[in-house]
């Protein structure tokens, strides 16, 4: 006789299979029949449409009035150069959401994505070919880079540009692909449960796990409108997270780490108050804290490890959610 249920089984297992730096499989199980696809499909849509990334939105090239122009001594036409630029993936540093960056090149040279990296921007596709300059030729240009989601057509930003700029179609999403498959999984001799496997590939601006985490946050934010009118009981996992030893340690003040005055002041001036804020940061985020030198960086990493955590390390999702609520409440 089939067991009668009053509530569907909630999945308990979560796994991440890191395939490469920019590709991962994210698995969760066991789901009741039909539940896996009900969650996987909207998550995939959020991954592709709502992941925040950077893209060039406009370019100004010395000596060029439009995208069908050319530059003396450059092998590529302006239109080809722009196409190559769109294939280049940018990441602004220091938390900036928009920047205008100037570049000057003199031939002969082969310009690649790596040549555009500087103190303001990181190129996460360094091997992208941009242009080839002949001897005695020069290429001077400015790029406007912005942060956004999805796709924005050049017509939508044209009116905001200064004279001389060429508007570009902007592809912001850092997620190159997101696919899923559903498999059956055995639970207590019952094969009618499901496992969802999400395959996520990014361009290097963010990790697949961060992209997945961001898509969950967007989904939760979209559902929050219902909770504003209808009181929904928090899942037991969140309630347990509020009482977990991890959360208590992560919400301790940074002075609990016993840092030197210089390291402490760097964090404090950047408004980093809790140990958990450091644990949630990536290594690049921590390195980009204003006036934080290598010695201070190494000290913070070491002290955090002594506390039981890693910079950019994995924390349980329920702990991350509870921790972010604590940080937002500061």
Curated annotation (Swiss-Prot):
Under the heading Gene3D superfamilies, the entry gives:
5' to 3' exonuclease, C-terminal subdomain, DNA-directed RNA polymerase, insert domain, RNA polymerase, RBP11-like subunit
Q: Where is this region: Alpha C-terminal domain (alpha-CTD)?
A: 244-330
UniProt keywords, alphabetically: DNA-directed RNA polymerase, Nucleotidyltransferase, Transcription, Transferase
SUPFAM superfamilies listed in its UniProt record: C-terminal domain of RNA polymerase alpha subunit, Insert subdomain of RNA polymerase alpha subunit, RBP11-like subunits of RNA polymerase
Q: What is its EC number?
A: 2.7.7.6
Entry's Gene Ontology cellular component terms: cytoplasm; DNA-directed RNA polymerase complex
Region spans: Alpha N-terminal domain (alpha-NTD): 1-230
Q: Which GO terms describe its biological process?
A: DNA-templated transcription
Q: What does this protein do?
A: DNA-dependent RNA polymerase catalyzes the transcription of DNA into RNA using the four ribonucleoside triphosphates as substrates.
In the record, the note on similarity to other proteins reads: Belongs to the RNA polymerase alpha chain family.
The UniProt comment on domains reads:
The N-terminal domain is essential for RNAP assembly and basal transcription, whereas the C-terminal domain is involved in interaction with transcriptional regulators and with upstream promoter elements.
| Subunit composition and interactions | Homodimer. The RNAP catalytic core consists of 2 alpha, 1 beta, 1 beta' and 1 omega subunit. When a sigma factor is associated with the core the holoenzyme is formed, which can initiate transcription.
User: Protein name, please?
Assistant: DNA-directed RNA polymerase subunit alpha
Q: What is the species of this protein? A: Sulfurimonas denitrificans (strain ATCC 33889 / DSM 1251) (Thiomicrospira denitrificans (strain ATCC 33889 / DSM 1251))
Protein's gene = rpoA
């Amino acid at each position: 006789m089939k067991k009668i249920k009053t509530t569907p089984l909630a999945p308990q297992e979560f796994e991440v299979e890191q395939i490469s730096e920019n590709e991962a499989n994210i698995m969760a199980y066991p789901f009741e029949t039909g539940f896996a696809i009900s969650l996987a499909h909207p998550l995939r849509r959020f991954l592709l449409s709502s992941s925040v990334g950077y893209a060039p939105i406009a370019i100004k090239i010395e000596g060029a009035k439009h995208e069908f122009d050319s530059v003396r001594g450059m092998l590529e036409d302006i239109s080809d150069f722009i196409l190559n630029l769109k294939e280049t993936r940018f990441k602004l540093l220091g938390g900036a959401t928009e920047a205008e960056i100037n570049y000057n090149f003199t031939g002969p040279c082969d310009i690649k994505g790596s040549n555009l990296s500087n103190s303001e921007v990181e190129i996460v596709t360094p091997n992208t070919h941009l242009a080839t300059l002949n001897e005695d030729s020069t290429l001077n240009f400015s790029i406007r880079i912005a942060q956004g989601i999805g796709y924005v057509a050049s017509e939508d930003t044209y009116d905001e540009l200064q004279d001389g700029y060429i508007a570009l179609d902007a592809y912001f999403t850092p997620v190159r692909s997101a696919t899923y498959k559903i498999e059956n999984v055995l639970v207590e001799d019952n094969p009618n449960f499901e496992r969802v496997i999400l395959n996520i590939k990014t361009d290097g601006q963010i990790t697949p796990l961060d992209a997945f985490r961001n898509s969950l946050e967007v989904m939760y934010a979209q559902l929050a409108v219902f909770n504003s009118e209808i009181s929904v009981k928090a899942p037991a996992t969140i309630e347990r997270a509020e009482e977990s030893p991890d959360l208590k340690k992560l919400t301790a003040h940074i002075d609990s780490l016993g840092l030197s005055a210089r390291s402490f002041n760097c964090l404090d001036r950047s408004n980093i108050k809790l140990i958990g804020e450091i644990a949630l940061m990536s290594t690049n985020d921590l390195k980009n804290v204003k006036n934080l030198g290598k010695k201070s960086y190494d000290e913070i990493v070491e002290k955090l490890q002594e506390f039981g955590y890693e910079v950019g390390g994995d924390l349980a999702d329920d702990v991350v959610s509870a921790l972010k609520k604590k940080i937002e409440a500061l």
